[in-house]
Structure formats: C-alpha cells, structure tokens
C-alpha cells in the first residue's frame, strides 16, 4: 500500500513513517469508505486513528526526520475530537443542501450516501437514508479534549493516547460494523452525558445571573483558604486600608490602633468579601438593567439622574471642589488661583455711574466716520425742549452713554451737567482713548470735534464742531416709531466763532427699528 489513509480520510505527508504503521492497523471487514469520486467525501465515516502515535514511534520518527507540522496538526485535530465536530457541521450542511429543491421540484444538489452505495455503481438520492440521519442525530455536540483545546508538548502524549484508546475500546459504537470491532472516535457514554449535563447547568446559571454554583463556591472557598494560608504573611503585614474596611462595612474591622495578628484578620476579610460577592450576585436578578443603546443612553442617564435626584448631589460635589480649589495655596502662601489679578470690567465701572438706563454702554470708535444719508424730512421736524433733568418713562428705551473726549487742556464751561457727566468716565485712565494728533485749530479750540455715542438701538449723535452743552430733545408724539428714545443734542453756547461750521453744526442720528433702518442728517440753528 503506497499511501496510508488515516485521521478521518486525510492523506499524511510522511509516507515512510506511516507505511510501517499501516501493518499494525486492524482494518474492518467491510470497507467503510469505498473508492469513489470526490463527491463521496462529503459524508463519509472517519477511520479510527492509528495506534502509531505512541511515544516510542514518535521518538523513532523524530530521530529519522524532522517532525512534520501538518501531520502534528492532524494528530491534534484527531486527539482533541475537532474533526468530529467539523464533520458534524459538514453533514448538517449536506442535509440542508440535499433538502433544498428548485421551483420545479427537482433537488438542487444530488447527494450520494457513501454507506449504502456499492463500490461499482452510483445511486443518487435527494435525501440521505434513515441510517445516516440516525447516525447524525446521535452524534453529540460537545467536544472534549486537552485543556486549552491544544495538546501539551511536555509529557502527556503517551498518557493521552492510552486514555483515548481505553475510551475507544471500552465504548459502544453507534454503528453495527464499528460495534463489532469495538472501535470508535468518541469518549465513553457516561463521560459524554456528564459533560453535557454540566454544560446545561452552566448555561442555566448564566441565564439566571448567578456566576457561582454550590460546587464552584465550595471549590473557590477552599482555594481561597489555601491561598490565604500561603500568602497571609505577605500582604497582611501592612495595615488594611480605611476605604477597604468601609467598603466591607463590617463592624468586625480591627482599628489601626490595635495591631491584630495576620492569621486573625485574614479569615474575617475573606468572609466579608465572600458575603459582598454573594450579595452582589443575588442583586443581579432584581436589577433588570436594560441593554446599552448608544443613541438613547445619554437620555436614559439624564432621566436616571433626574428621577433619583442626583443633580443636587453632583452640584454639591462640584461646589465643594470649586471651594477647595479657591482656597488652595502654594507653598509660599500665595493663592493657587488668584482672583485679584483680573482687570476690572466695564460693568464694574458702570456701577459708579448714575443709572440712566437699562442697557450697557456700547462705545464706538471715534476715529471711524459714520455713514450719513441726507433726508429732506429732518429740517421740517420740530423738537420741543424739556427743562430740568430728564424723567425717563418705562416705555421709553433710555440708554446709558459715555463721553470720550481727548482735550489738551481743561476747559472752563459754565454748564454743570456736561462737566458732571464727563468727569466720572474720565476719572478712569483706562477708559480714555489714546491721544490723537490735533491740528493747530483744534488745539486753540479743544472742545470742537466732540464725538458723542448713545448706545441705544442704533443711535449715534455727532457734533462736528462748536462749543455748547447737551440738552435733551424728545421726538414728537406723532413719531412713526413707537419705541423711540430721547435724543441728546448739543445746544450751542452764546460764544460764537467765525467758522461757518460753528454756525451750522452737523448732527447725525440714526434710529434702527425692529424691521427698518433710518439714518438722518440735519442741521441745528445757532442760538445767539
């Protein structure tokens, strides 16, 4: 025989080493796998593995040639019963493919049964025979083998072979021809049933949420005691952590002042730890936590925090952390996060100003010119003067304003209203604009070129030149804008100048309503 078929029909790659093994293999009387085409290999019965895997023959094989990795891989597949499970999957797939039919009722694939078809002829049927189906049904689904599902390379090859051969020789085979020879490829029936029973038990425990059975807990407790007795002198020399004793919540926790013996404290910690684990595992049944969904998880978390009123607790924790950070100091005594270095904001400066309105000031750059659009209706508008201080009503949108003036010398103006209003913003050097290069004419008359900004909804008043003081002008009652505010317009002093611009100063005002934008440019008459 040129080649030796072994390991479930696979052809080995080492002919010389396996040819001597073929003489010792006792072949059955009836040929299990007839010589047929490749279609017959779908559901064929595997041969029993050869007995040439003993340690002596393996040593001879290693001495003659280097070990063949493929042959060792086949040995591993056979010894750990991986081939049986693979064949089961293939046979199930074959049955499903054989049961499929086309729309015309013709079987989709013609499958030949290798057991019932003789060697000379070929007979195709759409479904396997009853014996084949019965053989497939009794095939177990649990595969046993070495730990980690891989054969150890140290010293258990001969032991594994002897145990496997003992199981094969002592087991009852599923087929009549294999039963006559007393050979098989499965472990004993008792062991198989025991393994399946243990597997079902483990699955039930997983469904119920209990990770420890009675036998496992006893075994783990014994293992815990054994490890604790061996390593108690190593990790109990130091005192237990305070948070660990609080986590256990045991009243039997020994305080740090008293130094107990390592042997006394160890069983207490172990018992409390086991109690905590058991209580947590028993609570898993009543929790009934929903599955994690990344789309709904933020909403669920927020709802959970709101339902259990955890937001105040979290806020208190954050406040405590902020207070601690504020009170933290460096080694030299300075605060870690100083708050006095921050510059005073405009809102703090504006608190010293008289409350003229509700909205904060919005100063504009005096260097940028404002676009003006001439309107013929403005000269015809008549303004009525109001004596005394302005009394703003709640309906009017009164605004707070700032005067930004860059004089070269302190002027003498008899009007107290303008002097009092410009004195407070100028007291702060930060609010003053940087000095601008002035012409000789502006140096002679420093109060010309006054730029006044009213940060109401879009009101800008500019006085090009001229000496005077401010006066409050209210718009007429028939104004088309219901939310109009008071206009602060300059009133010229009796002191006149020879320039034509002083006789007719330009005043630019703009009013922006909710849906409209109007900018007006007009002229004021000179009061002599």
From Swiss-Prot:
It comes from Macaca fascicularis (Crab-eating macaque). The modification Phosphoserine is found at residue 389. Keywords: Coiled coil, Cytoplasm, Cytoskeleton, Phosphoprotein. Its main location: cytoplasm. Residues 419-429 have a biased composition (Basic and acidic residues). Residues 43-68, 335-444, 497-528 are annotated as: Disordered. It is found in: Cytoplasm, Cytoskeleton, Microtubule organizing center, Centrosome. The keyword RNA-binding does not apply. Residues 497-510 have a biased composition (Low complexity). Residues 51-60, 363-378, 434-443 have a biased composition (Polar residues). The keyword Phosphoprotein applies. GO terms for cellular component: centrosome; cytoplasm. InterPro entries: DUF4702 (IPR031532). This is Coiled-coil domain-containing protein 116. Residues 81-104 form a coiled coil.
